[in-house]
Amino acid sequence: MPLRVCVLGGTGFVGHALVKRLAADGHSVTVLSRNMALHPERLLPPGVMVRETNVYDPDDLQIQFAGMDAVINLVGILNERGDNGRGFRRAHVELTQFVVSACRQAGVRRLLQMSSLNAGRGRSHYLKSRGEAEAVVKASGLRWTIFEPSVIYGIGDGLFTRFGQLLRLAPVMPLARADAKFAPVFVGDVVEAFRRALAEPRSVGEVYELYGPDVFSLAEIVRMTARQLGMRRWILPLPDALGRLQALAFDHVPGKPFSSDNFRSLLTDSVGGIDGLHRLGIEPTRVAKILPDILGHANDKQARYARFRARHV
């Protein structure tokens, strides 16, 4: 049955793919954005509307939620300004409180919440705030479902694509927490999990750990990226003392490619215990199947840029 769905974070990596899929399923999708000019509706799939909204204004949220059948909150950040946890609390905890309150006031009963594997079980502000946000959702009285993914990969991701960019810069990569473990999950599988849970009443009150079938160390992920790109690179694992110093230095680099809070997150392996994908009837996608597309896409963009520079510079 077609639903009216409001999505927060619908313009991000996961959100873009999810919104497209929900629209293809026939749902009426409203995406809340701080700046509509960045997302002209002519570029959106049929059935998707963007509304300019201050998501930190509970009254504005209530207005936008009116008449919706479900709300999906995908908002999340990996870094904050400074290192005191305030940015994470605002993006994860306070916003979730506003969303829950607005759902109640608008009469929306269904809430799907993005979280993270190890939410509430780690030393980082990121993981702590994710756990606090989950507690807000669980106490909301709404018909909620929570998703806890490991690191998410796909075309344009912040994992293989980002490491591909970094590997091009130097023959040596000093790597903090090189032995940290991940079970990367494909963005398409995450989207399918949200899609199925939205249509499945038995998903109400459930927490789904979303992770892939393969477990890799951080060093193995970097090596896979280099091999796929045909590069020979030396990975230099850093002891934790040097890794902390590296993170501290990057705290002051614009864009924070790595941070002290990222380092603390890496102290907890991002691997699951209860397979949420199989619980939803989804066969997890293996990295080897998608990696050529991810890095091939990145190579195509690099080649197009090189051709542009050759013509115009």
Predicted region positions:
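Conserved beta-loop-beta element that borders a ligand/cofactor-binding pocket
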Residues: S115, E134-G158, Q165
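Mid/C-terminal beta-alpha module of Rossmann-like enzyme folds, strongest
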Residues: R196-S259, G272-V313
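Conserved glycine-rich Rossmann-like NAD(P)H-binding loop of the short-chain dehydrogenase/reductase
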Residues: H27-R34
